[in-house]
Amino acid sequence: MEFDAVILSGGRSSRLGGVPKSGLMHDGATLLERALQAAQGAAAIAVVGPDPGTLPEGVLSCREDPPFAGPAAAIAAGLTALERHRGPDGRRRPVSPFTLVLACDMPRAGDAVRTLLEAARGEHPGGGLMAVAADGRRQPLVGLYSTAELQRCVTEAGQRGTLENASVFALLASLEVREVNVPGGSTDDVDTWDDASALGVTVPPGSHGRNSHEPVTRPGSPRQNSTLEANGEEPG
């Protein structure tokens, strides 16, 4: 199936002391690199957030306006970048019929994305597909959505003046999506140092941040999916 991808790599990382999540490491790759791997197969990819550094050839980079305006504004910026993207011949390329929306702070999201793509091939996804974790929690930042419907949601939110600092659930309220159960742990995200420890995520060598060898997980403490909470959203 043909799809584009919008990868969200912004956010203030307030509970990580401002350490950018995109640069944290998991199994030898940054979380941004993990997200790019999860989105492999996309016809075009836009990374939304602060300067991501060197990206693979052809991957677009943009920023939500204003910066730190929330995930809904970031999705809007990513869609705009994809719509304006021109190919090697200088011609504007048509957008793909579906867009993968993916936050970069879920190191195991590749399993969830593969499950969504398999579900889309088995049955027409309509307005889109949204990942649902093993505990029943909906995760709109692992979603495969109709590009036309997603653009409609963004346009309507912009016309209402409700795009900035809006939740993704509010943005997608009028979109008919099918919920898809994804493998356990595939939507677990990094919002705190305890989360990082539980997921085997560390700071890069030589960077400023919490000592990755310091024990941070309390035995028996529950893992929570906190991407929504980190973006100021109500858990589903």
Name each model feature, range by range.
Residues E2-S186, W193-D194:
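Nucleotide and nucleotide-moiety/phosphate-recognizing core
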Residues M1, E164-G236:
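Conserved alpha/beta core of the MobA/IspD/sugar-nucleotide pyrophosphorylase nucleotidyltransferase superfamily
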